[in-house]
Amino acid sequence: MNPTSADFVIPPALETAKPFGETEMYRILCDMEKIVPTKHNLNRVKNMSPFWKGDERSYNWFLDFVKSEWGEWIERYARGSHSLSPVTRKNGSPFQMVQAELWSLIHKPTWISSGFISPTCAVCMTNPVWVDFVWSCKHISTCIKCLKMLSRGSNGFKCPICRCQQRVRNY
């Protein structure tokens, strides 16, 4: 029996492999921003590659958090219930807290130090994280095996995403 094109199913692209502006999370945050404006400009991060690139577990955890906090509220707003006012808390509206958390996650992987989510190497995706790039880019964290491969044959090494010269912090 010869395989046909119908026999092969192309898996959908992973959300974390897409530019941030094409993800479901970005769309949800844009909807939220229409309801409650914040100091963060989502267009500034639209084409970024967030720290979770390739890390579906971390991405899905945060997406579930955003949906659980705001899913029903966004749906009610979309249906025309514009009279809803955001519930305020000590640190601002829940949306502003979600936005602030997202902003920090895009720029600095604080979840590594908190131990909340068990991080894996962003290069091989299997080994636990051993180092975090601590130069200005903060794009990626790696295991010791991938660190050795990245730094082989050079004076130091560069971030594989932005080519910024790196130094490391061990965990």
UniProtKB/Swiss-Prot annotation:
Keywords: Metal-binding, Zinc, Zinc-finger. A zinc finger (RING-type) spans 121-163. Pfam families: zf-C3HC4_3. The keyword Translocase does not apply. GO terms for molecular function: zinc ion binding. InterPro entries: Znf_RING, Znf_RING/FYVE/PHD. The keyword Metal-binding applies. Belongs to the IIV-6 157L family. This is Putative RING finger protein 027R. It comes from Invertebrate iridescent virus 3. The lineage of its organism: Viruses, Varidnaviria, Bamfordvirae, Nucleocytoviricota, Megaviricetes.
